[in-house]
Amino acid sequence: MYTHGHVDHVFGTPVFDAENAELGRPRAKVLAHEEVDPRFDRYIATAGYNGVVNQRQFQLPAFQWPTDYRRPDVTYRDHLDVTVGDTRFELHHARGETDDATWVWVPDRKVLCPGDVIIWCAPNAGNPQKVQRFAKDWAVALRAMADLGAE
């Protein structure tokens, strides 16, 4: 499951795909918010620009923006319940750092997986070289997660 479409959250998938192929197992299904796929399209269209911006921001002069993405197999708009074994996962959409963020609640275990809806600084409203963030919606999502009583 992708918590959002930033490259640091989606580029580990090929390792799992390769292992499954090597072991003769089917490829795992990737779940994500419906805006992840359009994000990948934007990333491909702006790869040169994103490469330059990220080289400067992260001081990585050799960094090349990727153009090959493992697309989601299952997408959702507002909310999706998924059961794996006997565990139910509630996927919730939030706009915060990105417009395609997902946070996950595991109600039977009172476990919260916030993805990057919780990061080292909030709200991170963005910077002039990147897409603006969604500070008000982000605050609403943080309150919704806080109200769950995660343990």
Feature annotation, model-predicted:
Residues 11-15, 41-46, 123-126:
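Short acidic, glycine/serine/threonine-rich loops at helix termini
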Residues 1-6, 31-33, 113-115, 150-151:
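Active-site neighborhood of phospho(di)ester-bond hydrolases with catalytic His/Asp-centered motifs
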Residues 5-11, 37-39, 98-99, 119-122:
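Active-site environment of divalent metal-dependent phosphoester hydrolases
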Residues 27, 31, 35-151, ...:
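Metallo-beta-lactamase
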Residues 1-29, 75:
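Active-site metal-binding motif and surrounding structural segment of the metallo-beta-lactamase
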